[in-house]
């Protein structure tokens, strides 16, 4: 009798311990994780708030505010390209082509930032020159029709075709070397899985070759990025859909990926930290996607990297939750200062201490050195909270958002009476 190699585990608490055990089990089978540079933990400003119609001048005019608030990365999102597939520069925005894009990256660098570029690999719009000149790149269905990506108006390219891989490797070199970007933001709900390919031009041994080749496709992108720019940031955002464990070795930043609530930010953080460990940064995505559009606490409290897509109201004609009003700017200043001071994104996330489904209030714990950090979340809470994971010693407890002392606790399983609305973030330091 021969079976597939199988992982079986008995749960203790929620899913965190089992997923972490699975990661360790896979590493013993030769599974390797990516490595992230130290600057990957810097806060991110993304130009997506300006939409696909973003203009270079809007980016330039926003940089002083981005710098004053303390962000480390500037991301140029969707809208720089002529179309999805050809990935040439929009001539209306970059009339001098590569020289204009390089000048933008140089300007971003001169202001002290790292530069990241949005890109959606493995898809192409129907009227792209790529598909006109290379229709044999397409991933085809059993009846010979092109497979459409459900969200984009695009067709799948086949990751098992060597020419498709080489085309994308050349794009990586252009983005990171010719234009000078420091990182990639890979985006698209099609990135975590592709259908079987029946394109006869690809000479597949079986239609499922495309499915099995997908992790190797992203390996090629990641390894090319690291070869041409060691330490390059490769963020992987599957647009609100699930991640594939087998692509995880091939990117060095995970993300909450278009969350629709703050709970999704926190639960995705717990899941991805279990599967990828603490050395790979988790980006909480743009704060505008969280509850109220301003819930930095959910990202900071779980050890995530903070980010935003804010716009300057004076630079847009349509206004919304991305507008950086004076009140929001004060809030941003406070949370960016907290993020930089604590840098919990570099701490050890202790997901095994609390059950996200049954422990009330919802609690997350991070150890950094000898200090413990706890994040409590509830619509409204008045009562005791348990501080798990402490040693048999005395600790001082402080609300690190307000700076207010909450007293002292002692020993294992310490309890603390608290009252809060929404969230409470505390630092527990040995005396």
Where in this protein do the model-derived segments appear?
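Composition- and surface-driven signal marking solvent-exposed, interaction-prone regions
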Residues: 19-23, 59, 210, 386-390, ...
């Amino acid at each position: 009798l021969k079976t597939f190699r199988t992982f079986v585990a008995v749960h203790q608490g929620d899913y965190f311990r089992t997923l972490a055990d699975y990661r360790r089990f896979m590493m013993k089978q030769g599974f390797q994780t990516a490595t992230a540079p130290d600057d990957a933990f810097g806060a991110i400003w993304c130009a997506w708030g300006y939409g696909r119609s973003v203009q270079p001048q809007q980016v330039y005019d926003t940089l002083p505010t981005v710098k004053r608030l303390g962000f480390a990365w500037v991301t140029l999102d969707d809208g720089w390209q002529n179309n999805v597939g050809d990935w040439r520069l929009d001539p209306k925005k970059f009339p001098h082509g590569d020289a204009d894009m390089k000048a933008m990256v140089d300007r971003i660098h001169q202001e002290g930032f790292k530069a990241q570029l949005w890109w959606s690999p493995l898809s192409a719009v129907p009227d792209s020159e790529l598909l006109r000149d290379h229709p044999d790149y397409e991933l085809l269905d059993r009846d010979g029709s092109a497979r459409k990506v459900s969200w984009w108006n695009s067709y799948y390219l086949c990751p098992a075709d060597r020419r498709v891989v080489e085309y994308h490797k050349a794009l990586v070199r252009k983005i990171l070397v010719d234009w000078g970007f420091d990182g990639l933001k890979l985006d698209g709900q099609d990135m975590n899985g592709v259908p079987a390919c029946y394109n006869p031009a690809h000479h597949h041994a079986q239609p499922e070759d495309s499915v099995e080749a997908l992790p190797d496709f992203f390996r090629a992108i990641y390894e090319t990025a690291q070869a041409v720019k060691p330490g390059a940031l490769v963020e992987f955002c599957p647009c609100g859909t699930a991640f594939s464990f087998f692509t995880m070795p091939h990117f060095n930043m995970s993300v909450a990926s278009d969350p629709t609530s703050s709970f999704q930010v926190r639960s995705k953080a717990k899941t991805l930290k279990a599967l990828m460990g603490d050395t790979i940064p988790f980006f909480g995505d743009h704060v505008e996607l969280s509850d109220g559009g301003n819930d930095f606490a959910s990202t900071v409290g779980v050890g995530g990297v903070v980010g935003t897509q804010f716009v300057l109201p004076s630079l847009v004609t349509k206004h919304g939750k991305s507008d950086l009003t004076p009140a929001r700017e004060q809030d941003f200043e406070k949370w960016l200062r907290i993020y930089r001071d604590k840098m919990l994104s570099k701490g050890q996330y202790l997901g095994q201490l609390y059950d996200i489904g049954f422990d009330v209030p919802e609690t997350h714990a991070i150890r950094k050195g000898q200090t413990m950090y706890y994040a409590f979340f509830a619509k409204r809470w008045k009562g005791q909270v348990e501080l798990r994971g402490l040693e048999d010693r005395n600790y001082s407890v402080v609300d690190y958002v307000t700076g207010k002392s909450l007293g002292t606790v002692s020993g294992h399983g310490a309890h603390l009476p608290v009252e809060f609305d929404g969230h409470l973030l505390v630092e527990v330091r040995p005396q």
